[in-house]
C-alpha cells in the first residue's frame, strides 16, 4: 500500500504492508528535487519502484539502518545506478542481512543488503542544500537532513510525538534529548519536522521542546518513585498503569519498561 501527498516542494511517500485491506504500519519516505530520503520496507518495494519509474531519484539518503528505511536500496541501485548515503556506522549494518524478531519480519520484512557510501556533511541538489546532522538516540547511526533556508527537517525516527509510552531496547533517552535540543537550537526562521511515520509538524521547535519537558518530567517522577523503593514494574504501574500491549507483541522490543529504565539512567 502506498500513498503520495505533496507538501511544498516535497513529495511524501507513505508505505505500509497491507493486511485485510488496511495498512499495518505506515512509514514515510520523502522525494525532494531528486533526493529520496529513506526507501521503505520490503513489502512495498514494488509499489515504490513503480512510482519512481516516473519520478526518478538522483540520489538516496538513509536516515538510519532499520529495516523499514532501507528495503528498496538494492532495487534502486540496480535500476537507477545512483549513490546511496548513510552514516558511517550504518554502512556495515545495511550491507548485511541482520536478524529480525518475528514482529519485524511480519510488519516490514527482510531488506536485501545494499552498498551505501559514507554521507558527507552537506547534500546538494539542483535547488537545495541539506545539512547532515548526527542525531543518535533512536539508534547510534541516526541522522537528519536540514534545509535551513526552507526550515525543513527530515527527522527520521528521532522524533515521533511530544509524548510516548514505549521505546526500543537500543534507544537511549538521554542521548535522544541531546539530539533534539541540538535541532531545536538551529538558527532557522521555522523548523518543520517531516517524520518517518508520516506526520508533519509545522511548529517543530515547540514540539521538540514539549517532548523535552515531557521526558524531564517523566524522569523526575520515576526517580522519586525509585528513591521511595519502587521497582521498575511498580513505577510503570504508577505512571502508565502497567506495561503497554505492544511489549508482548514485539518480544519486549517496544515497551514501557524500556522507557522507564532509560529515563532512570538520565542525569
Report residues per predicted region.
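Active-site HxH/HxHxD metal-binding segment of metal-dependent hydrolases
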Residues: 46-125
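Conserved beta-strand segments of alpha/beta enzyme cores
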Residues: 9-11, 83, 129-131, 192
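Active-site neighborhood of phospho(di)ester-bond hydrolases with catalytic His/Asp-centered motifs
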Residues: 37-40, 58-66, 84-88, 134-137, ...
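Accessory terminal helices/loops
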Residues: 1, 185-190, 199-267
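Conserved beta-strand hairpin/beta-sheet module of binuclear metal-dependent hydrolase folds
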Residues: 1-55, 144-156
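Short, flexible loop segments at the rims of nucleotide/cofactor-binding pockets, characterized by
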Residues: 13-19, 36-40, 60-63, 129-134, ...
Amino acid at each position: 500500500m502506498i500513498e503520495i501527498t505533496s507538501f511544498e516542494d516535497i513529495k511524501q511517500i507513505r508505505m505500509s504492508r497491507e493486511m485485510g485491506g488496511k495498512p499495518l504500519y505506515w512509514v514515510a519516505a520523502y522525494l525532494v528535487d531528486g533526493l529520496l530520503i529513506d526507501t521503505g520496507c520490503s513489502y512495498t518495494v514494488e509499489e515504490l519502484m513503480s512510482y519512481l519509474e516516473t519520478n526518478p531519484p538522483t540520489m538516496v539518503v538513509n536516515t538510519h539502518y532499520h529495516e523499514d528505511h532501507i528495503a528498496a536500496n538494492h532495487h534502486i541501485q540496480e535500476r537507477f545506478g545512483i549513490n546511496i548515503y548513510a552514516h558511517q556506522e550504518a554502512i556495515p549494518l545495511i550491507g548485511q542481512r541482520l536478524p529480525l524478531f518475528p514482529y519485524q519480519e511480519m510488519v516490514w520484512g527482510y531488506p536485501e543488503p545494499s552498498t551505501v557510501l559514507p554521507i558527507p556533511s552537506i547534500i546538494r541538489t539542483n535547488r537545495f542544500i541539506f545539512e547532515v546532522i548526527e542525531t543518535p538516540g533512536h539508534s547510534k547511526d541516526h541522522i537528519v537532513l536540514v534545509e535551513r533556508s526552507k526550515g525543513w527537517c527530515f527527522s527520521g525516527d528521532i522524533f515521533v510525538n511530544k509524548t510516548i509510552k514505549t521505546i526500543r531496547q537500543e534507544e537511549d533517552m538521554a542521548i535522544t534529548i541531546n539530539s533534539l535540543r541540538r535541532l531545536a537550537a538551529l538558527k532557522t526562521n521555522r523548523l518543520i519536522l517531516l517524520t518517518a511515520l508520516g506526520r508533519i509538524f509545522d511548529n517543530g521547535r515547540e514540539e521538540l521542546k514539549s517532548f523535552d519537558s515531557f521526558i524531564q518530567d517523566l524522569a523526575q517522577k520515576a526517580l522519586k518513585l525509585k528513591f521511595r523503593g519502587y521497582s521498575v514494574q511498580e513505577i510503570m504501574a504508577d505512571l502508565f498503569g502497567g506495561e503497554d500491549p505492544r511489549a508482548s507483541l514485539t518480544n519486549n522490543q517496544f515497551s514501557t519498561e524500556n522507557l522507564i529504565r532509560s529515563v532512570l539512567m538520565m542525569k
